[in-house]
Swiss-Prot record:
Topological region Cytoplasmic: 1-13, 78-79, 138-140
UniProt family annotation: Belongs to the DoxX family.
Stretches in topological domain Periplasmic: 35-56, 101-116
Naturally occurring in which organism (per UniProt): Escherichia coli (strain K12)
SS bond list: none
GO cellular component: plasma membrane
UniProt-recorded name of the protein: Inner membrane protein YphA
Sorted UniProt keywords: Cell inner membrane, Cell membrane, Membrane, Transmembrane, Transmembrane helix
Length: 140
């Protein structure tokens, strides 16, 4: 039982950390590219959410979801970027998925997405603590 309890993944650890980095940011890259390509629509969407300073919010969203996410995959500035992603992910949860202010059919999906964002922030906290692993530009 102790073997399973203290299993450290041995030689597979660097590969598994790479897979984890990709998995954590994949959602940002997938949804960030359309935000970047349709930037005017992103600004309008931010305004519709009631985001403060919609233009700035759209710029932050695009920068975090595309280049910053790609840097996480590459394992470059991983720990500081992971900390930024914690704040970004929690901020988007509060701004974009404020289910407590909603009614009807909007409550359920937004509650799910709010708590998914909280879980993703937890994954970024783990990444900030563990670092990117050996298969990274940071190599730590």
């Amino acid at each position: 039982m102790n073997t399973l309890r203290y299993f450290d993944f041995g030689a597979a650890r660097p590969v598994l950390l790479l897979i984890a980095r990709i998995a954590v940011v994949l959602i940002f890259i997938i949804f960030g590219f359309p935000k970047m390509m349709g930037f005017d629509g992103t600004v309008q969407y931010m305004a519709s959410l009631g985001a403060p300073m919609p233009m700035l919010a759209a710029i932050i969203a695009v920068v975090m979801e595309v280049p910053a996410a790609i840097l996480i995959v590459l394992g470059f500035f991983t720990r500081p970027l992971a900390v930024l992603f914690i704040f970004y992910t929690l901020g988007t949860a509060v701004i974009g998925h404020h289910y407590w202010d909603m009614t009807g059919d909007a409550v359920g999906p937004n509650m799910i997405n709010f708590w998914k964002n909280v879980s993703i922030a937890g994954a970024f906290l783990l990444l900030a603590i563990t670092g990117p692993g050996a298969i990274s530009l940071d190599r730590r």
